[in-house]
Curated annotation (Swiss-Prot):
The active site is at S40, K84. Changing R85A: Reduces enzymatic activity. Changing D131Y: Abolishes enzymatic activity. This is Mitochondrial inner membrane protease subunit 1. PROSITE patterns: SPASE_I_1, SPASE_I_2. It is found in: Mitochondrion inner membrane. The gene is IMP1. Catalytic component of the mitochondrial inner membrane peptidase (IMP) complex. IMP catalyzes the removal of signal peptides required for the targeting of proteins from the mitochondrial matrix, across the inner membrane, into the inter-membrane space. The two catalytic IMP subunits seem to have non-overlapping substrate specificities. IMP1 substrates include nuclear encoded CYB2, mitochondrially encoded COX2, NADH-cytochrome b5 reductase and GUT2. The keyword Mitochondrion applies. GO terms for molecular function: endopeptidase activity; serine-type endopeptidase activity. Belongs to the peptidase S26 family. IMP1 subfamily. Its EC number is 3.4.21.-. Changing K84 to H/R: Abolishes enzymatic activity. CDD domains: S26_SPase_I (cd06530).
Amino acid sequence: MTVGTLPIWSKTFSYAIRSLCFLHIIHMYAYEFTETRGESMLPTLSATNDYVHVLKNFQNGRGIKMGDCIVALKPTDPNHRICKRVTGMPGDLVLVDPSTIVNYVGDVLVDEERFGTYIKVPEGHVWVTGDNLSHSLDSRTYNALPMGLIMGKIVAANNFDKPFWDGSIRNIWGFKWINNTFLDVQAKSN
């Protein structure tokens, strides 16, 4: 070894550290690939083995629109994350539970007086629900979600229960795009 040169293992270690730092920055600020569990987003996402692609440039609610699927910190337990669909934006009037007047969500008793009532979503908050309303703990339970808890927008998912290859390049491991399902009826009628 000559003066001023590093052994090959030292260069390899240096490249590995740089790569890890780069991946950490991407994970923190740009993109995340994470698992989802639970029945609240059926049929959009499976109850198990669905992994979602999350874009973090939508963090803190930046650019979020009605109908987008998001990942957020759970307001009642910041150590857990939730995956829900935005069904109300700041200033919107939302019906607390449009599906039924039952006062149970799963096994959890929910305040019966709130059902059938309208709530105005406060500024800086969004109203979120699961696609499977009968099995979802969401804004109907913990009220409007502060936009500061939003970690990103879900744009796609992979279901690892599916075979790796089913003959289509578009369907590797059950890949699917997660679309915004909101249809603005007022805008369409004008």
